[in-house]
């Protein structure tokens, strides 16, 4: 049986997974999830510089923004599943995904970069 490390066991499991297409409920942009963190991992200066400060103790996501070269880092409370069935257009999509099936992206075989490398 796989056990989470004690320090992670108290965190909420992310509702979205890599490949899910989401919509930001506040700013209304669409994007695709590429990764998640159990809690906000951004530094305090970045967090305080945002227009809003959602709870840090919830999942946060790395999102490729549709029709943009941008990557955002929203909290789970800022996102909802996008059920339009429409694809996301982003220059980095091929770095993470190989296909789009049934409204979500399929992970490719390219190894993802290690954090802090």
Feature locations, PLM:
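Mixed-charge, Lys/Arg-rich low-complexity intrinsically disordered regions
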Residues: 1-21, 27-30, 37-40, 111-117
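Sequence-level detector for tyrosine residue identity
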Residues: 11, 27-29, 47, 61, ...
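Structured beta-strand/turn binding interfaces of compact recognition modules in eukaryotic regulators
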Residues: 25, 34, 66
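Surface loops and adjacent helix of pleckstrin homology
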Residues: 34-36, 76
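Short, solvent-exposed secondary-structure boundary/capping segments
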Residues: 40-49
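Phosphate-recognition beta-domain surfaces
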Residues: 52
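Intrinsically disordered, low-complexity, charged/polar segments
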Residues: 56-117
């Amino acid at each position: 049986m796989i056990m989470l490390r004690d320090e992670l066991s108290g965190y909420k499991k992310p509702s979205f997974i890599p490949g899910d297409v989401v919509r930001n409920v506040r700013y209304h942009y669409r994007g695709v999830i590429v990764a998640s963190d159990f809690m906000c991992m951004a530094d305090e200066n970045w967090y305080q510089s945002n227009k809003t400060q959602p709870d840090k103790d919830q999942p946060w996501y790395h999102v490729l923004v549709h029709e943009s070269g941008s990557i955002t880092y929203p909290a789970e409370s800022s996102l909802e599943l996008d059920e339009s069935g429409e694809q996301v257009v982003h220059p980095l999509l091929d770095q993470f995904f190989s296909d789009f099936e049934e409204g979500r992206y399929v992970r490719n075989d390219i190894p993802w970069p290690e954090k802090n490398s």
